[in-house]
């Protein structure tokens, strides 16, 4: 997969328009987690090289459940087997909306636990067997309906992005 970081950001660090489709769990309403994110981001702001980072906005804190398609990454192994690589973005949105109109697996909570702090993210994993099973069911369902299965599907590292390193240190 190509490095999309330079495409995601303007030179001044602001986010560029970056269209695509991904299934996420929005976390910005989780008060306990947001307190931790605020502490981590405040420490980042104290770094002498903070200008090389863009911190994730508070209202965008999420955990990616499964990546789907990105307009800027039209490579076969990162694309739907059901759609041509040149499919217009709106057709992709419409296709996924139809395929995932029924999303029956969201009734139960999924509990995650922190495994470690990465350079730019909090690494997490399912906290119990039920959560691991539910998360895998969701990922399998979406993958099958969307025709998308990235090479790292079975070993995806769940994480919560605190920020993005735009310029190498």
Task: Tell me what each language-model feature is.
Residues 1-169:
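Histidine-dependent nucleotide/RNA phosphoesterase domain, centered on the 2H-phosphoesterase fold
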């Amino acid at each position: 997969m190509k490095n999309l970081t330079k495409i995601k950001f303007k030179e001044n660090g602001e986010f560029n328009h970056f269209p695509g489709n991904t299934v996420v769990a929005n976390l910005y309403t989780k008060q306990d987690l947001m307190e931790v994110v605020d502490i981590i981001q405040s420490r980042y702001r104290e770094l002498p090289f903070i200008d090389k980072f863009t911190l994730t906005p508070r209202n965008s804190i999420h955990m990616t459940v499964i990546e789907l398609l990105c307009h800027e990454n039209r490579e076969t192994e990162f694309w739907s087997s059901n759609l041509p690589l040149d499919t217009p973005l709106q057709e992709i949105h419409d296709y996924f909306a139809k395929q995932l109109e029924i999303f029956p697996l969201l009734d139960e909570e999924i509990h995650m636990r922190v495994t470690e702090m990465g350079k730019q993210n909090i690494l997490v994993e399912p906290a119990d067997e039920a959560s691991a099973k539910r998360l895998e069911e969701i990922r399998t369902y979406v993958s099958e309906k969307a025709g998308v299965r990235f090479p790292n599907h079975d070993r995806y590292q769940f994480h919560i992005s605190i920020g993005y390193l735009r310029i190498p240190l």
